[in-house]
Swiss-Prot record:
GO terms for cellular component: extracellular region. Belongs to the glycosyl hydrolase 7 (cellulase C) family. The gene is celB. Glycans are attached at residues 43, 153, 395. The active site is at residues 216, 221. It is found in: Secreted. It catalyses: Endohydrolysis of (1->4)-beta-D-glucosidic linkages in cellulose, lichenin and cereal beta-D-glucans. This is Endo-beta-1,4-glucanase celB. Its main location: secreted. Pfam families: Glyco_hydro_7. Keywords: Carbohydrate metabolism, Cellulose degradation, Glycoprotein, Glycosidase, Hydrolase, Polysaccharide degradation, Secreted, Signal. Optimum pH is 5.5. Disulfide bonds: none annotated.
């Protein structure tokens, strides 16, 4: 695994109580492509989410700054005291957390064998721009009138698993501030349309229990049995975040704590899952499916605008697959649609328009969004929303984490050759 050492030069100019040991991030080669000049290698790495890092009392490393109920109240009665008391340490062994890279390939593993026992690590990583060695930021992707392409191997993802690749409108700096000098270098700043309440928001103590909300574009949520792509837009204006990326929802209604999809963000979104939309023979394990998930394949997602420019309004999200050198057009579903549009969403996700529809999602894509990749399973719902019932062929119990751990302890996802750029510039096929 290629490694990149972050020397954390910031640590020489700010309190060492906030940044602890250095971070060693794995290199991941990615590519930016243009129609005129082809694809150019990018200087990028990945960083694990800050919550994976040790965050502890500066004077006693054995005391964590979080508990099972959130922040440690003795160390974090307010934001400033929390920042003074708590240290975030770097991670030097990414493989121990289920993350390995080799050139342009990223492998995420759900379980690790620790002293003969399986441990669930469920890593989530973000793409980091390493072009400035002194102050790393996330690589923000602006994808209006552009496409994003990657090769994926989901053959080791059974029912109940989710190997995800998606975009979050988090701050490129990771919310770096006087109270959070670590920033993107240590994986801070995460948010999404689910508005989860976590101990930290932008690397600062979440004293008031707010939810961390932002626009989210799920390019890829999948296992070997089912797949979907889903935009999740939010109703806040960018200036309401004060440049911090995260919108902090403060009330049960705004955060949609009841799960009724009537808060500040569209938690349900408008998804394109071929199985759920009536084409049950398109995606699955074996040569009887148009996309055979027992073998690797390439995924192309195009964000098309009304005028074909990066300043136009998003009108369509189109999907292509490439396998064995052949382009496979996206599934045609029972309605006759083969892409995600406002028209399709009006019939399948009536709430989507009230969150701004395609145009609302497009505004976030135009501003720039951060790439996240993860692997996880679902102890509460067994991932049935993705691959069971009307959404896929999996039965009601085979997605249980304990079943996966017993029968597929090696479960993993491999992402490779991440490329973004002009429409038609990121892939070649007959």
């Amino acid at each position: 695994m290629a490694l990149l050492l972050s020397l954390s030069l910031l640590a020489t100019t700010i309190s060492a109580q906030q940044i602890g040991t250095p971070e060693i991030r794995p290199r991941l080669t990615t590519y930016h492509c243009t129609s005129a000049n082809g694809c150019t290698e990018q200087n990028t790495s990945v960083v694990l989410d800050a919550a994976t890092h040790p965050i502890h009392d500066a004077s006693n490393p054995s005391v964590s700054c979080t508990t099972s109920n959130g922040l440690n109240p003795a160390l974090c009665p307010d934001k400033q005291t929390c920042a003074d008391n708590c240290v975030i340490d770097g991670i030097t062994d990414y493989a121990a957390h289920g993350v390995e890279t080799h050139g342009s390939r990223l492998t995420l593993t759900q379980y690790r064998n620790v002293n003969g026992a399986l441990s669930s690590v469920s890593p989530r990583v973000y793409l980091v721009d390493e072009s400035d060695p002194d102050e790393q930021e996330y690589r923000a992707l602006s994808l209006l009138a552009q496409e994003f392409t990657f090769t994926v191997n989901v053959s080791a993802l059974p029912c109940g698993m989710n190997g995800a690749l998606y975009l979050s409108e988090m701050s490129p700096s990771g919310g770096r501030s006087a109270l959070n000098p670590a920033g993107a270098s240590y994986g801070t700043g995460y948010c999404d349309a689910q508005c989860y309440v976590n101990p930290w928001i932008n690397g600062e103590g979440n004293i008031n229990g707010y939810g961390a909300c932002c626009n989210e574009m799920d390019i890829w949520e999948a296992n070997s049995r089912s797949t979907g792509f889903t935009p999740h837009a939010c109703l806040y204006e960018p200036e309401e975040t004060e440049g911090r990326g995260v919108y902090e929802c403060a009330s049960e209604d705004e955060c949609d704590s009841a799960g009724e999809n009537d808060g500040i963000c569209d938690k349900w979104g408008c998804g394109f899952n071929p199985y759920a939309l009536g084409n049950t023979e398109y995606y699955g394990r074996g040569q009887g499916f148009e996309v055979d998930t027992k073998e690797p394949f390439t995924v192309v997602t195009q964000f098309l605008t009304d005028d074909g420019t990066s300043t136009g309004a998003l009108t369509e999200i189109r999907r292509l697959y490439i396998q064995n050198g052949q382009v496979i057009e996206n599934a045609v579903v029972s309605s006759g649609a083969d892409s995600l549009t406002d028209s399709l969403c009006a019939s399948t996700a009536s709430w989507f328009d009230s969150y701004g529809g395609m145009e609302g999602m497009g505004r976030a894509l135009g501003r720039g969004m951060v790439l996240a990749m993860s692997i996880w399973n679902d102890a509460g719902g067994y991932m049935q929303w993705l691959d069971g019932g009307d959404a896929g062929p999996c039965n009601a119990t085979e997605g249980a984490p304990e079943f996966i751990e017993e029968h597929t302890p090696w479960t993993r996802v491999v992402f490779e050759d991440l490329k973004w750029g002009d429409i038609g510039s990121t892939f070649q096929a007959s």
